[in-house]
A protein has these predicted regions:
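Detector for Asparagine
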Residues: 3, 19, 56, 76, ...
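Glycine-rich short-loop/terminal segments
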Residues: 1-51, 150-152
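Caspase-like cysteine protease fold
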Residues: 107-152
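Generic detector of well-ordered alpha-helical segments enriched in charged/polar residues
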Residues: 6-10, 61, 65-68, 137
Length: 152
């Protein structure tokens, strides 16, 4: 679907409240690429804005920034695509999205075969980018305590 990233974001923002904990995308991917509404092997050389990658991230960041309004204080994004977080291009893409949306963004480093219960978890190692280039400890310490819980 052409302009599928815009359509997906519009649908999500229209349906979600302001306290989303996890937003998970499933689709085709490779290092530094997350397909949102595209099929496998389109390969026509035209940017249909149906995937997020290094060639279109600057055009799509204003669209993706609209997702910031749906997240609660511990919100995060996961791309359940094959290898999206692999290599420098994958890590750079995830960091740009984390900085733009203001939540941690995680993606797989290897192929994700899916099927059955594996569809709902990462298969193998992942990379997580935190807003501002922070790490897990610093990001968590900047979050409010969960109501009714205190840190140990």
């Amino acid at each position: 679907m052409s302009n599928g990233v815009e359509q997906a974001v519009s649908d999500i923002v229209g349906a979600a409240g302001g306290n989303v904990f996890l937003l998970r995308f499933h689709g085709y991917g490779t290092s530094g690429v997350a397909g949102i509404s595209d099929g496998h092997g389109l390969g026509d050389g035209i940017d249909h804005r149906s995937s997020i990658d290094s060639s279109n991230i600057h055009q799509l960041l204003p669209v993706l920034r609209r997702l910031a309004s749906i997240f609660g204080p511990y919100g995060n994004i996961q791309f359940m695509h094959c290898s999206t977080g692999r290599g420098a291009s994958g890590q750079r893409l995830l960091q740009q999205i984390a900085d733009g949306v203001g939540v941690p963004v995680t993606a797989a480093l290897r192929d994700q075969l899916g099927g059955g219960a594996n569809t709902f978890k990462f298969e193998g190692p992942t990379f997580t980018a935190f807003p501002g280039g922070n790490n897990l400890r610093s990001w968590c310490s900047s979050r409010p305590d969960f109501p009714g819980f205190t840190p140990a």
